[in-house]
């Protein structure tokens, strides 16, 4: 959790700062509100990317493509759209902070294109094998499919991301045992 030492706690500013450092890699407000150093604040964004990339650790994604995917996911995170609403103080002293999120539709928007390009690649492999060329290894084929997926996502990001219907989420902030908000 994040630590806050201010006497006059502003839950709306706190949530805004946490979202900005988590998704936009904007650290200034977060540093001011939490007392974190610039390095600590930047680490929040990097840790979120680490968590995203951990999901691929057990996947057959080629190691050489991981830095490209990491950078792309960072760019995608920076495009997340949210609005922090008016805070409501709960009876137990905690705060309920409504956040309206517009989800990115990149992955669903690009799925059909990816499927089509993956099928085209499979057809190319079949054609070349039928013409007497060696069958690519599973690793080579998986590597090519991950490259295709990266290219499709990259194209989607470059052509402008689209958003789905806004959803409302409520974040709850309370003091922990040390008297810090998280």
Task: Name each region found by the language model.
Residues 25-29, 104-106, 179-181:
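Primarily extracytoplasmic ectodomains and periplasmic/lumenal surface modules that are beta-strand-rich
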Residues 30-39, 136-137, 141-146, 162-169:
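Short glycine-rich, low-complexity/disordered patches
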Residues 118-134, 140, 159-182:
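Short beta-strand edge/turn micro-motifs at domain boundaries
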């Amino acid at each position: 959790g994040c630590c806050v030492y201010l006497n006059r706690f502003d839950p709306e500013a706190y949530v805004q700062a946490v979202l900005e450092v988590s998704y936009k890699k904007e650290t200034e407000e977060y540093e001011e509100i939490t007392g974190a150093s610039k390095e600590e604040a930047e680490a929040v964004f990097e840790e979120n990317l680490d968590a995203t990339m951990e999901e691929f650790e057990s996947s057959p994604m080629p190691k050489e493509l991981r830095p490209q995917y990491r950078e792309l996911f960072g760019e995608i995170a920076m495009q997340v759209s949210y609005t922090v609403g008016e805070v409501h103080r709960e009876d137990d002293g905690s705060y309920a902070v409504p956040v309206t999120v517009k989800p990115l539709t990149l992955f669903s928007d690009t799925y059909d294109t990816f499927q089509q390009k993956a099928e085209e690649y499979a057809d190319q492999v079949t054609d070349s094998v039928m013409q007497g060329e060696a069958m690519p290894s599973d690793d080579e084929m998986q590597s090519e499919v991950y490259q295709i997926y990266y290219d499709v996502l990259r194209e989607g990001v470059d052509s402008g991301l689209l958003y789905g219907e806004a959803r409302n989420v409520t974040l709850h902030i309370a003091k922990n045992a040390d008297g810090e908000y998280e």
